[in-house]
Amino acid sequence: MFARVITVHAQPGKIDEAATVYRDSIIPAAKKQKGFKDAMLLTDPVTGKGISVTLWETEADQKASEASGYVAQQLGKLAAVLAGPPARESFLVSAKS
């Protein structure tokens, strides 16, 4: 299993709006992607920092979601509330409950 971690910083006072978009639009879209397993958004309402973690069945599934433009499309849904560009990282999931 593989994880994509995307860190964002929301404009002041906009982290709740970002969480709503993530919950109501991004997660439903993710569920339609091949190999998608799970998603969560961690937020700090004081700093406006958000960390998205998505889990993928295989590395190929994760990379395909990037190559297809899916990830860019989802980040575009957050563009109006972000203070800067997101940072993307990928990881092998070494342990999970």
Which stretches of residues belong to each language-model region?
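Glycine-rich beta-strand-turn "strand-cap" elements at beta-sheet edges
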Residues: 2, 7-11, 37-47, 74-97
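Intrinsically disordered, low-complexity segments enriched in polar/charged residues with Gly/Pro
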Residues: 14-16, 26-29, 41-42
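Intrinsically disordered, low-complexity acidic/polar segments
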Residues: 15-17, 61-63, 97
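Short, surface-exposed ligand-recognition loops at beta-strand->loop->(often short) alpha-helix junctions
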Residues: 9-19
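An amphipathic, aromatic/His-enriched active-site/gating alpha helix that lines ligand/cofactor pockets
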Residues: 24-37, 55-89
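Short, charged/polar surface micro-motifs in flexible loops or helix N-caps
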Residues: 12, 47-48, 58-62
